[in-house]
Amino acid sequence: MKRRGFLRLLLGGAAAGALGPWRGEALGATDFRRVRPADAGWPGANAWKALGQQLRGGLARVDSPLAAGPVSPELLKQMENPYFVGDQAWATQSSGWGGAWSSKPSAWAVSARTAEDVAAAVTFARKNRIRLVVKGGGHSYQGTSNAPDSLLVWTRPMDRIVLHDAFTPQGCAGKVGPVPAVSVGAGALWLHTYDAVTTRGGRYVQGGGCATVGVAGLIQSGGFGSFSKRFGMAAASLLEADVVTADGKIRTVNACTDPDLFWALKGGGGGTFGVVTRLTLRTHALPETFGAVLLNIQADSDAGYRRLIERFVAFYKTALFNPQWGEQVRFGPRNRLGIQMLFEGLDKAKAEEIWRPFLAEVEKPDSGLRIEPGRAVVSFPARAFWNPEFLTTKMKDHVRSDPRPGAPANNVWWASNQEELCIWWHGYESTWMPESLLADARQKDLAAALFAASRHWSLSLHFNKGLAGSPPEAIAAARETATNPAVLGAFALAIIAGGETARYAGVAGHSPDETEGRSDAQAIGAAMAELRKLVPDPGSYVSESNYFEKDWQRAFWGNNYARLRRIKKKYDRDGLFFVHHGVGSEDWSADGMARLRS
């Protein structure tokens, strides 16, 4: 199924030095600096050897073959495989962002296999004043899973998945009843987790849509998947987590034990409050069916396209604005409407019945609209949706498989995500669209804004990433997360973004096009400006947002930020954990190496 890969995405601001209104201090004013490998305070060989001897996993220097001179065609081919990329300590799923960051490996990496390995790495970094980086799936668009001159805590080997028929969080006996759940190591990926929970276990767990996204990072950012309109945010399903905090302590946190830290892990941002080593998530009863409606509609004029957008907005409000429908619709600059909607709990006949009134209008001889070849309505048993055998046989045109000899059979990914692999971002922005825009009196304003934005750049509405229209219990659970409360009243998340696939800074013949990047950034910014006229004070989803967002504290967390800031000071007063635009990052230089004086 096509996912967010098919759109061309965004950028609103272009000042690489924009650090936000909460950071007004001079960058040179500091009372603490971390050390780099060339500094006298950097640990010597014996210190690194001693660290390695503490580990059940491994410790190694990290070098990128992309920086070692001419890059072989064989390596570039391997980089087309997200599982290969994820298996390299030096690599990240995005390669950089123009004017912001480029992927650079850490100096050393701890390949963690246990929470004790993580604790040893955290303690070593704290005592030696070393910049610490955490990477599981490595999907951060903001570059938070890589940094030069750092120690990487690489959790990828921690990928164990265990199903529970009845799970009670530690210390919660007698306070909450046992529920079906799944415990997942911090290095597990979502496709593997779905395969275990749904294919083999016959249950559903709310996770992300991209197969190779890491479970831990998604939960800590809030997290949405194709069926979040029904089951809510991924973070809202968190029952318990094991986390190593800055003091090196391994904590088991839940609503009964360290509830403030537990809350912060549910959407407060990854790599900020500690290193998560294990998560336990509530599982849900599996719907009977999943399915999709896929089609593209071409309008023969601007006026016809505006009418088409108006019709779709009205149709969405009356027929699709409910828990059964998720995913997205794309509005293109060439008067093309791309529909990639997923549903749950319906058969094919019912899905076709729901869409029949809208399509009847589109297919009228005088409509000025044309449905392109390839229209499809499909429905299948939900238990098959992440079954590798089903995907690679019945949906082989929509998926790709890991071609490496001996690769696990469930190393599968959506083909439409291919263009995001090793992407060099020109920009990315998002904004939650409030439900009030669907009111009859506002629908024409919404349609006009979508049309105006599409004149500059393609944009998508991700209906599964707004919780308005969800069941009350899903909204109530999301209210107990740290994510910006704007999500609760939003019917969709609008995304505008773009970049170049398989581009690598400094690699001859494969470097990003800076001129194209600047042009794209301007167009993306202009498109978002059209939506800002309609939604002047929106929230933004932390994982899919503008690197240069100035008011990031409010945009990502709204009025939850003050509480997150207090929790950060409680568990990481010295700021060991730093990520770009993470909670508390306003106290540091842009590279996280120097603390700023308040």
What are these regions (language model features)?
Residues K2-S598:
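Soluble FAD-dependent oxygen oxidases
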